[in-house]
Amino acid sequence: MEEFQGYLELYRSQQHDFLYPLIFREYIYALAHDRGLNRSVLLDNVGYDKKSSLLIIKRLISRMYQQNHFIISLNDSNQNKFFGYNKNLYSQMISEGFAVIVEIPFSLRLVSSLEETETVKSYNLRSIHSIFPFFEDKFPHLNYASDVLIPYPIHLEILVQTLRYCVKDPSSLHLLRLFLHEYYNWNTLITPKKSIFAKSNQRLFLLLYNSYVCEYESILLFLRNQSNHLRLTSSGILFERIRFYEKIKYPVEEIFANDFPATLWFFKDPFIQYVRYQGKSILASKDTPLLMNKWKYYLVHFWQCHFYVWSQPGRIHINQLSKHSFDFLGYLSSIRPNISVVRSQLLENSFLMDNAMKKLDTLFPIIPMIGSLAKVKFCNTSGHPISKSSWADSSDSDIIDRFVRIGGNLSHYYSGSSKKKSLYRIKYILRLSCVKTLARKHKSTVRTFLKRLGPKLLDEFFTEEEQIFSLLFPRTSSTLKRFYRGRIWYLDILCINDLVNHE
């Protein structure tokens, strides 16, 4: 009955947007702890042990309200703000619990939007690889792409203000301000170099940052959709000249703020495409470089005027797709012409026709990847494999499993590469590094160790897909060769794991 009463209280809070009472409910923190365990890839959970107490959390929240935040002295660093308790544990508990509560309005909006549009829930659309089929379909018809780095807000108040449109509970927002202020002071006194985006509180700040990006993209999408409804008029020729003289007299932001129809006309482009992953986005268009420069300077002024975030135009790079490649999601992508010769027969005359088509080319970044392998001591900066000395104390099966897992993840993620030769080189580095690590552990040479184990050791590095293809088709068949050369996009990749995570 108590569990039913708790969920009933949760439902009533959702209906009236009263999120503040949920902060003092223990099942919220238990739910946050369970989510932390299920999302161990993103978070390193510090534990919901027996020493944790909801009473201590209430005392901490009360103390945040009682403190005078206008008086901050250096002597505060010597004071124990948590009465002798583990402040890292309880700061993470409060942040994770608050993140679960604030996610409630976003979840309700998502469910209602799916029900209204009758959208089929497809988890395949969450895959990172689902972006590249979109590139293959749209980008060959475009000419220019802007590489945009979304700036981070300098002041935390900007992040709180972006939540006002979804979270309509003033008490919750006020408590969030106090917590951010308090936690920001802890981090500046304890770990000043790591800033506020610490690993232990990643969930809350990811939520705040995503709300900030969502606000930015909603305005950008509104301008994009509204500009498509504008029609050509006879005064369109005079628009550029009028805007030129107004820019001389007034700042650009005043023009955008006072003349909204002109702003929409300013960005009339039916071929604009926008893609984002985390803090990096691609803005591509079929139009001229002039329009891309308009978007570039508008984004800079938009961030400065609306979010009070300073951004330099140099953070936005405009490249021609046919001449330059852009780095996105670990791939070097570019548009290259694919010329095919077609023989045509017309009565007694025959002639050849060159059919030129543009194709998306996705390359494996061999040089950055060698740098990453050298950073974690799999090879040197020249790409020569070396032994992993820190793993030499592990068992043979554990060492082999670690190397096989890293090689399998790289093969799985970079299966969409147009040219697999660079990927095979990386796998060769991992194989030889594994052999050298095992030889170092057994105090033997590489040649002697390979003779003792035979080729079975290297067979461990074949991925599951390669083993299935080798069973279905003979290794000499042309079908298997096409599979090796062709691009394969997987719809089960939800995040990019860094090599350091395998330490």
UniProtKB/Swiss-Prot annotation:
Q: Which UniProt keywords apply?
A: Chloroplast, mRNA processing, Plastid, RNA-binding, tRNA processing
Q: Which InterPro entries match?
A: Domain_X, Maturase_MatK, Maturase_MatK_N
What does the record give under GO molecular function?
Answer: RNA binding
Give compartment(s).
Plastid, Chloroplast
Listed GO CC annotations = chloroplast
Gene Ontology BP annotations = mRNA processing; RNA splicing; tRNA processing
Query: Where mainly located?
Result: plastid
Name the family the entry cites: Belongs to the intron maturase 2 family. MatK subfamily.
Q: What does this protein do?
A: Usually encoded in the trnK tRNA gene intron. Probably assists in splicing its own and other chloroplast group II introns.
Q: What name goes with this protein?
A: Maturase K
The source organism is Rosa multiflora (Multiflora rose)
From the UniProt record, report the name of the gene that encodes this protein: matK
